[in-house]
Amino acid sequence: MENLFELHADVRVEQGKGASRRLRRAGKVPAVLYGAAKEPISLLFDHNLLFRHLSHDAFYSHILTIHANGKAERVVLKALQRDPVNPNKVLHLDLQRVSSTQKLTIKVPLHFIGDEMAPGVKQEGGTVARLLNDIEISCLAKDLPEYIEVDLADLGVGETVHLSDLKLPGGVEIPALKLGEDYDQPVVTIHKPRAAAEEEDTGAEGDVEAADAE
């Protein structure tokens, strides 16, 4: 995957909650960089510059280059904390170093295609219900995809695409599937048209009333 994002950071010297509050008021975002058998480093990012990157969906699933203390580190975003009152305010970042020899676990977005061509929509008038927007995958950095494609072109009413149905790029795995069938989550399904569903409900109610009358 092409590296599209480069960020510059300062090494953080001040520690503690009080220092964090002062730094945030000064327009800085505290962060921690860890992994790859190296010591964790506390960093500071400029909030406004960081927020511009966060407006791109690809930022969350790409390998990022962080320049700090005269060195460049390849990392992925592992956690992002926002202000619960003001979501446009970023409070903290967790960044993990990327190793060329160790698999990383990261969430990537799902891209749905073929909605309009799906028999359940085009011929049967059903409604697409997306149950997941992203999934957690495991792979080497060189195999990291920007997204996973979900093709609905052959999906009918009442049919569901599960995690195990997804076509994954080479070298990519879904860790949840190793835990058993109970973890094979539904990804997307096509519901019956509302009128048909209401007719079925009405018919079921009529059957119950007839049975009660007997």
From Swiss-Prot:
UniProt GO MF annotations: 5S rRNA binding; structural constituent of ribosome
InterPro entries: Rbsml_bL25/Gln-tRNA_synth_N, Ribosomal_bL25/Gln-tRNA_synth, Ribosomal_bL25_b-dom, Ribosomal_bL25_C, Ribosomal_bL25_long, Ribosomal_L25_dom, Ribosomal_uL5_bac-type
Stretches the record annotates as Disordered: 193-214
Highest taxon listed in the record's lineage: Bacteria
GO biological process, one term: translation
Biased composition, class Acidic residues, residue ranges: 198-214
Nucleotidyltransferase among keywords: no
GO-annotated cellular components: cytosolic large ribosomal subunit
Keyword set, alphabetical order: Ribonucleoprotein, Ribosomal protein, RNA-binding, rRNA-binding
Subunit structure: Part of the 50S ribosomal subunit; part of the 5S rRNA/L5/L18/L25 subcomplex. Contacts the 5S rRNA. Binds to the 5S rRNA independently of L5 and L18.
Family: Belongs to the bacterial ribosomal protein bL25 family. CTC subfamily.
NCBIfam families: bL25_bact_ctc, PRK05618.1-2, PRK05618.1-5, PRK05943.1
Function: This is one of the proteins that binds to the 5S RNA in the ribosome where it forms part of the central protuberance.
This protein's name: Large ribosomal subunit protein bL25
Organism this protein belongs to: Nitrosococcus oceani (strain ATCC 19707 / BCRC 17464 / JCM 30415 / NCIMB 11848 / C-107)
High-level lineage: Bacteria, Pseudomonadati, Pseudomonadota, Gammaproteobacteria, Chromatiales
